[in-house]
């Protein structure tokens, strides 16, 4: 009887390729899976398999995304690649594929182009924490000075958007040659894989973050008090701990006196679990859906924020007409809608369906939020846009 192969539990990291159209993002994705599958096992994916990306829906928005996976020496990676520029914009704004780090692909033959800049800006706005650069098509450049020049431009561009341009790793390679099996260039892909292992730190797991539970429902149980239910977004809650109720109304402190899951009593509720939390001395009408239960002091309510937003086009079920400043839709955060008004950048008169845009939002009541929180924009219950908080304005 053959023995099962021993599986070491590996750190799981989410990455993706970003960069200008035709600079080689998909070719590099194929090359990574091909080169690494030879060394560490796993499945090689051909260019066509990745390029014909299936449609997915995230927050009601159709996005074409290819997901591949591969192993490196120390880790397991899930990697996203998008065929079109619009798909990147939607993907990054909706957080459909959250990235722990991105591989920026820049063709050495072109240098940084408009979408290179736009993707770096988006990565900054939506909180992609780390960028590694793959300078592609270096087999087509004989002039070493030209390579140095392109590298300098890329570093300047990264620094412009608050990434560490001076210290960001840049690998000079050729995705196509590596995909064709050329050893010199395959070694560059292996170099990229070890840089991913060393440069992108292990992400903080949601269980290690402070406790947060978006409230979905509120009940009162006679003789026991008020119970709020929801899915624990992060951290751990234990019986007897002090918690805060944040958002919509003034922040209130209370104590958790009991935790239930599937009608069983628990000592604690953990990230990912659906639980009911019994609150001491809290009245039924003091809590509502849309607030959050959190570890005291770890999240504050805010009404004003800067955001990066994608507006659905009409084929996606969005608006058929543009909107202008003073537009008042609902902003759906976690479990609830809050009305807000928008401020557009000075040079923008109107926003068309299918656009992505920076806007400042003023909500009529405050919501517990931090930078990086995702939201949907809705009109009468229908999603017309998706956004991410890029900066809270206190």
From Swiss-Prot:
Residues 10-204 form the tr-type G domain. Residues 19-26 are annotated as: G1. It comes from the Bacteria. It is found in: Cytoplasm. Mg(2+) binds at residue 26. Its EC number is 3.6.5.3. Residues 136-139 are annotated as: G4. Residues 81-84 are annotated as: G3. One of its GO terms (molecular function) is translation elongation factor activity. Monomer. Belongs to the TRAFAC class translation factor GTPase superfamily. Classic translation factor GTPase family. EF-Tu/EF-1A subfamily. This is Elongation factor Tu. It comes from Blochmanniella floridana. The lineage of its organism: Bacteria, Pseudomonadati, Pseudomonadota, Gammaproteobacteria, Enterobacterales. The gene is tuf.
């Amino acid at each position: 009887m053959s023995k099962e192969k021993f599986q070491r539990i590996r750190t799981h990291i989410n990455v993706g390729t970003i960069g200008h159209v035709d600079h080689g993002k998909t070719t590099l994705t194929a090359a990574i899976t091909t080169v690494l599958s030879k060394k560490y096992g796993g499945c090689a994916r051909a260019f066509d398999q990745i390029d014909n990306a299936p449609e997915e829906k995230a927050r009601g928005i159709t996005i074409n995304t290819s997901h591949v996976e591969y192993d490196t020496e120390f880790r397991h990676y899930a990697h996203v690649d998008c065929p079109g520029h619009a798909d990147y914009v939607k993907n990054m704004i909706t957080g459909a594929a959250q990235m722990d780090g991105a591989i920026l692909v820049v063709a050495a033959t072109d240098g940084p182009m408009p979408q290179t800049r736009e993707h770096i800006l988006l990565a900054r706005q939506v909180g992609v924490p780390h960028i590694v650069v793959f300078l592609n098509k270096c087999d087509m450049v004989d002039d070493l000075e030209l390579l140095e020049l392109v590298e300098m431009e890329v570093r300047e561009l990264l620094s412009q958007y608050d990434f560490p341009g001076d210290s960001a790793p840049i690998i000079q390679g050729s995705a196509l040659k590596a995909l064709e099996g050329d050893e010199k260039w395959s070694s560059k892909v292996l170099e990229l894989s070890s840089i991913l292992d060393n440069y992108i730190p292990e992400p903080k797991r949601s269980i290690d973050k402070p406790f947060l539970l978006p409230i979905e429902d509120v009940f009162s149980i006679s003789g026991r008090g008020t119970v709020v239910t929801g899915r624990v977004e992060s951290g751990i809650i234990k019986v007897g701990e002090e918690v805060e109720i944040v958002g919509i109304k003034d922040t209130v402190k209370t104590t958790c006196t009991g935790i239930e899951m599937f009608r069983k009593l628990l000592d604690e509720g953990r990230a990912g679990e659906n639980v009911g939390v019994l609150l001491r001395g809290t009245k039924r009408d003091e809590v509502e859906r849309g607030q959050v239960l959190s570890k005291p002091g770890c999240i504050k309510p805010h009404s004003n924020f800067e955001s990066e937003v994608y507006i659905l086009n009409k084929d996606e079920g969005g608006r058929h007409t543009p909107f202008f400043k003073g537009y008042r839709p609902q902003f759906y955060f976690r479990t609830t809608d809050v009305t807000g008004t928008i401020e557009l950048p000075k040079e923008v008169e109107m926003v068309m369906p299918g656009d992505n845009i920076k806007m400042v939002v003023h909500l009529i009541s405050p919501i517990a939020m931090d930078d990086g929180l995702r939201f949907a924009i809705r009109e009468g219950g229908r999603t017309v846009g998706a956004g991410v908080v890029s900066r809270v304005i206190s």
